[in-house]
Amino acid sequence: MELYLDTASLEEIREIAAWGVLSGVTTNPTLVAKAFAAKGEALTEEAFAAHLRAICETVGGPVSAEVTALEAEAMVAEGRRLAAIHPNIVVKLPTTEEGLKACKRLSAEGIKVNMTLIFSANQALLAARAGASYVSPFLGRVDDISWDGGELLREIVEMIQVQDLPVKVIAASIRHPRHVTEAALLGADIATMPHAVFKQLLKHPLTDIGLKRFLEDWEKVKP
């Protein structure tokens, strides 16, 4: 399973990319707005394009960039503009009627599409049939309403395997490291997570205790 970072912060991307384990990045309008607010920079079309280009050059893998339009025609136009920024851009569309229409057209043009805001296996099936390269079920948000995000992911992964659909599953809305383990065990192709969760994957108190003990023992006997 590949690991993606769900952020638009170049600083966070550079930090995790240095670990050598980062395969891609997912963004959305909220994350982009936060990144520009943190920089104190105006969010112009030119600045946005330059920012996305910098992300693509840093990570070297797929970077999902989401449209803000709601109608298919406008989604297609915006998707084309996003795809033109860098070859690694994947156009992110909402799983709606208009999103499906736009997905069909963009994918027919050779533009990769990530269908997002998926909360059912049927939505994932529709997205795959519309030509999506990726589908993104939201584990955390499903858990939030007392449903089972893991069960949703299991259904989608199994359905795609049974139907032999050429689409990758991105486990999204990851809230904690257990979600990552669950996604890997259930067969997700990718898990995308916030910077804080990515950092937590590495943390374990016994690792810190063990390292401290090794160093203390070495100090006692070193020449």
From Swiss-Prot:
Q: Which GO terms describe its molecular function?
A: aldehyde-lyase activity; transaldolase activity
Question: Where found?
Answer: Cytoplasm
What EC designation does it have?
2.2.1.2
GO biological process terms on file:
carbohydrate metabolic process; pentose-phosphate shunt
Q: Which reaction(s) are listed as its catalytic activity? A: D-sedoheptulose 7-phosphate + D-glyceraldehyde 3-phosphate = D-erythrose 4-phosphate + beta-D-fructose 6-phosphate
Pathway named in the protein's UniProt entry: Carbohydrate degradation; pentose phosphate pathway; D-glyceraldehyde 3-phosphate and beta-D-fructose 6-phosphate from D-ribose 5-phosphate and D-xylulose 5-phosphate (non-oxidative stage): step 2/3
Q: SUPFAM superfamilies recorded for this chain?
A: Aldolase (SSF51569)
Q: Which UniProt keywords apply?
A: Cytoplasm, Pentose shunt, Schiff base, Transferase
What InterPro entries does the record tag this protein with? Aldolase_TIM, TAL/FSA, Transaldolase_3B, Transaldolase_3B/F6P_aldolase, Transaldolase_AS, TSA/FSA_arc/bac
Q: Which Pfam families match?
A: TAL_FSA
Output a single Gene Ontology CC term carried by this record: cytoplasm
Q: Which residues form the active site?
A: 92 (schiff-base intermediate with substrate)
The free-text function statement in the UniProt record for this protein reads:
Transaldolase is important for the balance of metabolites in the pentose-phosphate pathway.
Q: Which HAMAP family match?
A: Transaldolase_3b
What family does the entry list? Belongs to the transaldolase family. Type 3B subfamily.
What is the official name of this protein in its record?
Probable transaldolase
Q: What is the species listed in this Swiss-Prot or TrEMBL entry?
A: Thermus thermophilus (strain ATCC 27634 / DSM 579 / HB8)
Gene symbol of the encoding locus: tal
